[in-house]
Structure formats: C-alpha cells, structure tokens
C-alpha cells in the first residue's frame, strides 16, 4: 500500500461488508461461485470464540430504547414519543398523506398501453385499409384486417405483461426490512410501510430505508454513505445529525426519526431528476417507425403507378379502390410490431430467469450493440471478499503471534465485523494455535477504526492476567505509534518500509500489526497483506468478452497500483491511469482531442469519482461507441442514465436500479457477458424477421403492381389478406428460434438491411412471375400443367410457400442448412404450408374449384427451386464485402471533429476553474 493509500480503512473501502447486505436475500439468488467460501463458517466461528460476548450483545439489544428529545424540525414529524412511537391511526393518516416509502414508478394505464399498439405508421396504414374495405362493403376483408390489428395488439400487450410480471416478482424479492417502534412495541416491517415520524431502530448492519435524524442522546454511529456521496470513509453521526436512505450503519446503535420517505428522500429526489432528464423515443422505436414510413412511401409510389396506368385504361373507381386495398394490405406488414415485441418480451423473460431484470425492452437491442463496457472492479471483476496473504513478520515474531494479535483487535459483535475482521477470522482455519488461544483472552475494551489515527485498538487480558494493547491498521501509522514510544532498530525499520512499498507496487493492501504488553515498550510485529482477489470466472469471462468484440475498461475508486495488479491477473490491458489525468477538476494540459484519444486507448482508470465515470462515458459516446456502464450507488445514477445501456449490479441502491436499463441480481462479470450473448441472439431474431418481412412486402408490391399495370389482373382480395396473415402467423415463433449470437457488436445497418430485402424481394417477384406464366397459359390445355385448376389458388400457394420458407434463409448467418431451426418455428411454418395447400387443393375461395395434386406438387417443386435461388443469393450478398461497401459507402471523417473536441474540453476546464473561483 502506498504511503498516501496506507489507510486501514482503504482495505475496507471496497470490501463486501462495507455496506451490509439487505436482511432479506432474493429468492432467486445466484449460487455462490465454487471457490467462494460462504460466511456461514464465520457465524459458527464467532459462536465458538465469542459466545459470552454474543450473549451480552443479545441482552443489550433486548433493553428498551433510550428516550431522547428530538431536535426541532418543520411540522410535527419529530414530535413522536421515542418510547412509544406512532399509533396505528397516526400511521394510517400519514400514509394517506405521504404515500408508501418507495420511489414512484411510472405506472402506465393498461387501457392506454393497449391502445398504443394501434398507433404508428404501420398501424395507421392498416386502419386506413380497414376503412377502405368498409367503404367497399367488403365485410370479409374488413373483419380480417380488424382481426389482424387486434391480434397484433393482443399479442404485444400479453407478451409485455407476462415479461413485466416476471420482473415484478423478482423486484419483490429485493425488498428491505425496517425495525420500527409503534405503540410501545418493536416491529419488523417491510421498508415501504415506514411513514414520516416513525422511530426506526438502527443497529450495526442496518440499511437505512428513509431520510431522518438521529434522536438518541450521546450516541456515536458510523454510517457508510458511499452509495450516496462516494465518500470512502464511514461518517460519524451524533444526536441531531441527518441520515439518508440507502446508507448502511457500520458501528453503533441508536434511534432515528423519519423525516422523509419515498420520492421526498435525497435518493428519491436524485432519482427523479435523473429520470426526468431521460426522454424521447427509443432508438428501436425510431427504427421501426422509419421502416414503416419508407414502406408507406413505397405503397404510395406503387399506387401512383397503378393509378397512372388505370387512367389510360379508364378503370372504374370501384376497381381502383380494390387495387388500393390490395396494395395497402400487402405493402405494410401489420404484424411487424407484434412479432418484434414478442421476440423481445420472450427474451426479457428468459433474461429474468438468468437474474437480469430488463427495465425496458429496448435495452435488449442496446446491449446487443455495446462495444465498450465500463466496469467497476469490486464485486464485478473481483469477489468483493478480502483474503489474506503470507504474513511478513519482523525478527523474533512468529506468524501465529501476528495473527493472534490481529484477531484480538477485532469486534466481538457479529454485526460489527467488517471485511478485514472476517478475513482474519477465516484465516484462523490455517492457524490452529491462535484459534485455540483466542478464547482464553478477555477483551476489556474495543475501539473501532479511528479515521484520525487510522487504526483499530483493543485492550485485552491474557490468560495469566497480563494486560495487552493490540492494534492493527495502516502500516505507516502503526509504525508511527511504535516510534513515538521508542526507537526502532534500523534493520527492522528498513525491512518493514521496504515491504510496505513492495506490497503496494504489487497491488496489495497491507495492515500493520503491533502490541504493547503491560510494563513493556510497544512492539512492531509485522505486516499482513490482503487483497480482493479476482472472481474465479473473471479471467475466462474477460477472454470471452474480447472474443465477442467487447472492450472492458476498468473504472475503480482503488489506487492505480491495485487496479493494475488486478488487470494483470485478469489478462486485461494494464494501461490504467489516475482519473485526475482527465483534467476534469480544471487542471490538465492535454488538448481536448488528445483527452479523447487518451480515454479511447486506456484500459481503465483508478481513483475514480462519479464525475469521471460520466466523462468517460460521454467521451466514448462522442467517438461513436455504444457504451455500457455498471454502477451501484446513487452517485452512479447520472452515468447509468447517460450510458447506452446502464447496468445496476448486484446490491445496487434503488436510485441506481431506477436509472439503469438492466438490473442484475447475480454477481460478477460473467452474468453480464451471458446477458450480452442472449441479447445478440434476440437481436438476430429481430433482424432476420425484419429483413424477411420487408422482402415479402417488396415482393408483393413489385409482382402485383406489375401484374396490375401490365395484365390489369388482381389476385382475389381474400387471398391477399390471408397471404398477409400467413406471413406473420408463421413467424411469430421466431421468438423461440435457435438463433446464433454474433461474434461482434450488432447494430441496425439499415442500408444493408434494405439492400438485402430489396434484392430478395426482386428474386421472389421474378420467381412468382415465372411460375405464373409457365404454369398458366392462355386458353385451356396450353399450359405445362394440364387441368391446373384456378389461377388465384396457384398464385396463392406459390407465394405462401416461398415467403414462408424465406425465414429459414434470413435466420442463418451462413448457408440455410448451417443452423437447425427450433421445433416451434418449423412447426408453425409447416402448419401454415399445409393450410395454404388445402386452400389451393379445395379452392375454398373460388366456389370449390379444385386444383389437381399434380399441379400442387409442381408448385411445391417450383417453390423449392425459387427457395434455393434466393438462399444462394442471400448467402452471397451476406458474405460480400463489396456489397457492404456499396450499401454503406466509405465512412466520412469529420475534419472538424478534433477541433470541436478541443473546444469542448477547454470550455469544461474554464467552467470548472470559474466555479472554484466563485467558491
């Protein structure tokens, strides 16, 4: 540990018990990693070692709370009697006035949410088609179109509701508890039942669930506010001092009166401001609306061409309206929103089963395209559990003596144990001597960590009655304690300091240990190195992330040396710098463009504060990257909201969860990478369906448009409607398909998407034209297939077969046989194919005019031939770099970009200096 980082508390800073976990664990909590030792052995060990002290602690807890006068505050919130608390009638009255103690969620009106499934460019076109059918008194088409619109809305609404139900169940498992005094009795309640004026009982390990004030006189609490303010050290709280929701009590016991709940708390107000800053339509919705708008324009262009041809042929108005209805139905895919929503909702439910709560469905698309993941270190890359290394002892001191002394300088209360105490107690399994001796010592007085002296002190009595003072803490501060008592031999002093420097350079935190036996001088004993080791799966996950084209940047509040050592162990890059080099505090002399280059090239930053996280995300986004950000505290909320995908990690505060797009209940980076793979699979399903559905619309627009213009013939309107229905019904099962995941981030490459869809649509149109002209000749018995039946049924079957089979082409990254479709998708397509064949054979829409089996078999053969041609075409275009260049062109480089970056950073620095000057 470096000199300036040589604080005992630095070892606690990112330790697992810094902020005690909620008393109620999620019902679906992820299983611990194989090499992570559970804390159950700690409880058993404490029971064995400190049974008398634990009993005394329990007796203390049973005492009635001490009364104390509250400090005057506005209204009557602090006038509650501290012994009796509120009455139930007062609780009900205040709950009606102030509501539940929870941040308000934007509750959507179910009816309005359902109605919104009828809003959008695609839906408007279908509604226009329904009105047109009603005007033509074509009640069959009118009913079918309305049913199609209703099916789209019902499927989308039900799927989102089911996914939301799963998320709500998981959220319930995260509920906190609160110990409240009401009507003179102590009750344990759900935290959301707390109201202003309630008296809460605080104990070591309590997570404070509302804002309030300490009301116990002469009390000394230490509260961890790192989730709110980012302060690494616990804050001292005395009578009258404010407390904030999401803080954790580290030391002491007392009472507080609740002054604010829910959205009125500091956390709630911060979350409200962050959420208010977010607005606008999601990127995915913009993509769908853009596709619908372009298809609508194509429909209008097709109708213009048809109307122009009809003008010269003097076509009747009623016939023109039929043309309009047909082209409108086939030109805009009404099922597109429903299928895509279903795909994302099913994916969200699957992610929820893997402990990832998707707050909004569009986050799935964003996560699939993430190129850079800015990850915190503690708990995500590491275990968030301290482990001890090999002790360094000075001459004449054994490792057993050092461990025994360090364990004596530990809390005797189970809830008072910090991460360092737990680490030492776990280490006793490897030190049987100190373990057997520990119970023979009696602790006379224990002084918790003092941020001034940076050490923990315990006064104990040995079995022979000798009194010993034991300390552990920041190595150089422990050394100072000994030096103030007597000079230390030069060789011991040199070896001790060298070891401190060596451990710091290797990324270890270190603790100095010393003791003073009654009647003797202080004795320096040695150093115990400790570290937060990487999770067992992190190195493998980092390697997998690289394979997936994802860059992981470490952003940590730890010292740079610690961050570098962790990065080295994980196989990450070691270009990790102090966040101060970003120059956000008004300093720094790098031009803005160089700051952008610096952030882009860095593998991470140490000694990071929330403003650094926000700046890193902003810079990467301005460079064109899609960025994901992990966080857990209130101060992380702006960064989580700023990122393209905000990720609240396990144990995150309500504010962080509210600001995030995805909330993870399972610890570690592997859960995030697994979710990323799943999101890419979901994106692939959506992308393949959109290509498929646009191609179908273009296919029918091209074929029927030319057929109307050249031949002045129109397919039966009922069959046109059923073609549209079959195209969407068959592919609803795409949500359950065995989709591959891309090995690189995926985005909506719209030029390429439209290029592929257009070419495939043209191939389909040519295939349909050839089938029609070769199988159906002018006059009886002049076609290739004799006794073929009715033209509409032949066209209907060929169009249905080739369109349904297209999904097997677009769903694969390689040849169509390279990936086996799911049984749901295969079954749905087969069922629709059989139904379409029955339509053709029995002529259900042409008064029973049947088509021969021979003709039907020939149609299947023609359709399979067309399928092979479009499969080959799609594969060639998908693998062609030239096609991509033709669709996207060369990337344009902005000459002014670096100048703009220089200006932005200069303005930020000037603003910061100005604020400092005003202060």
Curated annotation (Swiss-Prot):
GO BP of this protein: proton export across plasma membrane; proton transmembrane transport; regulation of intracellular pH
Compositionally biased tracts (Basic and acidic residues): 1-16
Keyword annotations: ATP-binding, Cell membrane, Hydrogen ion transport, Ion transport, Magnesium, Membrane, Metal-binding, Nucleotide-binding, Phosphoprotein, Translocase, Transmembrane, Transmembrane helix, Transport
Chief location of this protein within or outside the cell: membrane
Designated name of the protein: Plasma membrane ATPase 1
PANTHER family named in the record: CALCIUM-TRANSPORTING ATPASE
NCBIfam families: ATPase-IIIA_H, ATPase_P-type
One Pfam family this sequence matches: Cation_ATPase_N
Extracellular side of membrane: 135-138, 312-322, 737-752, 846-858
Annotated organism of origin: Schizosaccharomyces pombe (strain 972 / ATCC 24843) (Fission yeast)
Active-site residues per Swiss-Prot or TrEMBL entry: 376
Function of the molecule: The plasma membrane ATPase of plants and fungi is a hydrogen ion pump. The proton gradient it generates drives the active transport of nutrients by H(+)-symport. The resulting external acidification and/or internal alkinization may mediate growth responses.
């Amino acid at each position: 540990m470096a000199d300036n980082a040589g604080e005992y508390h630095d070892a606690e800073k990112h330790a697992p018990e810094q902020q005690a976990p909620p008393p109620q664990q999620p019902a679906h909590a992820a299983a611990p990693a194989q090499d992570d030792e559970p804390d159950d052995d700690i409880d058993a060990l404490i029971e064995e070692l400190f049974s008398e002290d634990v009993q005394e602690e329990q007796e203390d807890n049973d005492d009635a709370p001490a009364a104390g006068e509250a400090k005057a505050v506005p209204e009557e919130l602090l006038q509650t009697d501290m012994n009796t608390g509120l009455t139930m009638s007062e609780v009900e009255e205040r709950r009606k006035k102030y509501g539940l103690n929870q941040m308000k969620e934007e509750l959507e009106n179910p009816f309005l949410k359902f109605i919104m499934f009828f809003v959008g460019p695609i839906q408007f076109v279908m509604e226009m088609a329904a009105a047109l059918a009603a005007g033509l008194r074509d009640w069959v088409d009118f009913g079918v179109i309305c049913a199609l619109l209703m099916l789209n809305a019902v499927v989308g609404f039900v799927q989102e509701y089911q996914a939301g139900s799963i998320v709500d169940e998981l959220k319930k498992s995260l509920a906190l508890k609160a110990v409240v005094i009401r009507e003179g009795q102590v009750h344990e309640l759900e935290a959301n039942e707390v109201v202003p004026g309630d008296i809460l009982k605080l104990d070591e390990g309590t997570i404070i669930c509302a804002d309030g004030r300490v009301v116990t006189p002469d009390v000394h609490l230490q509260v961890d506010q790192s989730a709110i303010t980012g302060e690494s050290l616990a804050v001292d709280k005395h009578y009258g001092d404010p407390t904030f929701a999401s803080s954790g009590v580290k030391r002491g016991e007392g009472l507080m009166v609740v002054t604010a709940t829910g959205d009125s708390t500091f956390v709630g107000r911060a979350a409200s401001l962050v959420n208010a800053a977010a607005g606008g339509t999601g990127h995915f919705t913009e993509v769908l609306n853009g596709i619908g708008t372009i298809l609508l324009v194509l429909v209008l262009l097709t109708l213009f061409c048809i109307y122009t041809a009809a003008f010269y042929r003097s076509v009747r108005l009623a016939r023109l309206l039929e043309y309009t209805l047909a082209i409108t139905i086939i030109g805009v895919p009404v099922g597109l929103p429903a299928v895509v929503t279903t795909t994302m909702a099913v994916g969200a439910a699957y992610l929820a089963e893997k402990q990832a709560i998707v707050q909004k469905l569009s986050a799935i698309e964003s996560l699939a395209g993430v190129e850079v993941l800015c990850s915190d270190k503690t708990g995500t890359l590491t275990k968030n559990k301290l482990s001890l290394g090999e002790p360094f002892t000075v001459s004449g001191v054994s490792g057993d003596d050092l461990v025994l002394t360090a364990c004596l300088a530990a809390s005797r209360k189970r809830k008072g144990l910090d991460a360092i105490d737990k680490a030492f107690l776990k280490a006793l399994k490897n030190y049987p001597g100190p373990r057997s001796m520990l119970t023979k010592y009696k602790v006379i007085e224990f002084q918790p960590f003092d941020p001034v002296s940076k050490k923990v002190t315990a006064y104990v009595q040995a079995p022979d009655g000798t009194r010993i003072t034991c300390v552990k803490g920041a190595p150089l501060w422990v050394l100072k304690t000994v030096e103030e008592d007597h000079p230390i031999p030069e060789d011991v002093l040199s070896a001790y300091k060298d070891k401190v420097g060596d451990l710091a350079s290797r990324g270890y935190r270190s603790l100095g240990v010393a003791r003073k036996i009654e009647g003797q001088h202080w004795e320096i004993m040695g150093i115990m190195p400790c570290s937060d080791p990487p999770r067992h799966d992190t190195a493998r996950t980092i390697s997998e992330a690289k394979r997936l084209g994802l860059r992981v940047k470490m952003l940590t509040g730890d010292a740079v040396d610690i961050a570098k050592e962790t990065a080295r162990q994980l196989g990450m890059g070691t270009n990790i710098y102090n966040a101060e080099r970003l120059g956000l505090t008004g300093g720094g002399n790098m031009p803005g463009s160089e700051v952008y280059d610096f952030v882009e090239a860095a593998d991470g930053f140490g000694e990071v504060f929330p403003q650094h996280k926000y700046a890193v995300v902003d810079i990467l986004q301005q460079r064109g990257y899609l960025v994901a950000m992990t966080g857990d505290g209130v101060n992380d909320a702006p960064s989580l909201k700023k990122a393209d995908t905000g990720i609240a990690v396990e144990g995150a505060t309500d504010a962080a969860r509210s600001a995030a797009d995805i909330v993870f209940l399972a610890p570690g980076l592997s859960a995030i990478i697994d979710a990323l793979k799943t999101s890419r699979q979901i994106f692939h399903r959506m992308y393949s369906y959109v290509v498929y559905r646009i191609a179908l619309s273009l296919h029918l627009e091209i074929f029927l448009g030319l057929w109307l213009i050249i031949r002045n013939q129109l397919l039966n309107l009922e069959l046109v409607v059923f073609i549209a229905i079959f195209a969407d019904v068959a592919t609803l099962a795409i949500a359950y398909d065995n989709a591959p995941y891309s090995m690189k981030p995926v985005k909506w490459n719209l030029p390429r998407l439209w290029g592929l869809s257009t070419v495939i649509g043209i191939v389909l149109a040519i295939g349909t034209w050839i089938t029609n002209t070769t199988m159906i000749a002018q006059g009886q018995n002049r076609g290739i297939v004799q006794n073929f039946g009715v033209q509409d049924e032949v066209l209907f079957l060929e169009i249905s077969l080739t369109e349904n089979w297209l999904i097997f082409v677009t769903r694969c990254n390689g040849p169509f046989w390279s990936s086996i479709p799911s049984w749901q998708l295969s079954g749905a397509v087969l069922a629709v194919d059989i139904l379409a064949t029955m339509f053709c054979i029995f002529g259900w829409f042409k008064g029973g005019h049947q088509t021969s089996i021979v003709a039907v078999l020939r149609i299947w053969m023609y359709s399979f031939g067309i399928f092979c041609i479009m499969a080959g075409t799609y594969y060639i275009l998908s693998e062609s770099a030239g096609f991509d260049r033709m669709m996207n062109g060369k990337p344009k480089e902005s000459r002014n970009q670096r100048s703009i970056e220089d200006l932005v950073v200069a303005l930020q620095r000037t603003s910061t200096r100005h604020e400092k000057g005003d202060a």
